[in-house]
Amino acid sequence: MTTPHAVIIANPHAGGGRARNIAVKAQSALASAGVNVTLHLPASREQLRVISRQACAEQPAVVLACGGDGTVHDILQSAIAVNTTLGIIPGGTGNDIARSLGLPRKTSDSFFHKMAKSIHNQHCELIDASKILRDGEQVWSLGVISTGFDSAVNERANRMSHLRGTFRYIVALLAELREFQCHQYTVTIDGVQHRDSAVLIAVGNGGNYGGGMRICPQADMKDGLLD
């Protein structure tokens, strides 16, 4: 029997640095279960994207994204382009995609044992992905696509590199509340155009965002629909 090959690509900074330790633990656990594992700890987001493209092009049994939703999003772009199986090892702050898929918030020996078994059995499940055309560029998403207040908060939080974890999002939210105004949106759904002002618009493949907020509670990542 051929030994399956799994590639772990981890964002070593995700989850306040926890993703690095989780990835090392995953490598050890999967290797002990008879999986040939290659671990990458890229130093930057651009390096992560380059490694993702290279790893997915080699068509291993699975490419495992270890980190938060941003890490999963970046690796997804490469995996879906060449139809490579993508797995998720939760290691970020929010882990909303993993949460929407029913994965545990904290990894354990049992989690890695089940993962190794799935890799050996070549077991995977098909899930939905959203395709977005942005300035002529095609982008894929597994979670919630949104615009408005939440996006403004996220953009502000990303600029607060001096703050860590969820605290910076709380600070960004309070700062954005002071100056945010509603915007006019035109949305076409099933051929019907809607125009209105809104604080935010969210389109969900998965139901969670923002670290567990159920913005689209009826969303199902396997029903072929966006909510």
Residue locations for each model-derived region?
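ATP/NTP phosphate-donor binding region
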Residues: 1-63, 73, 110-117
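Short beta->alpha linker loops
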Residues: 43-47, 67-70, 92, 148
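ATP/nucleoside-binding phosphotransfer catalytic cores, i.e., glycine-rich phosphate-binding loops
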Residues: 19, 189-190, 195, 215, ...
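Internal helical hairpin/lid segments
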Residues: 199-227
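Short Gly/Thr/Asp-enriched flexible loops that form oxyanion-binding sites at enzyme active sites
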Residues: 71-84
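Catalytic core of DAGKc-family lipid kinases
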Residues: 33, 81-85, 91-199
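Short glycine-/acidic-enriched loop or helix-start segments at secondary-structure transitions
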Residues: 74-76, 98-99, 212-213
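Glycine-rich beta-strand-to-loop/alpha-helix junction loops that act as flexible
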Residues: 12, 66-68, 89-92, 205
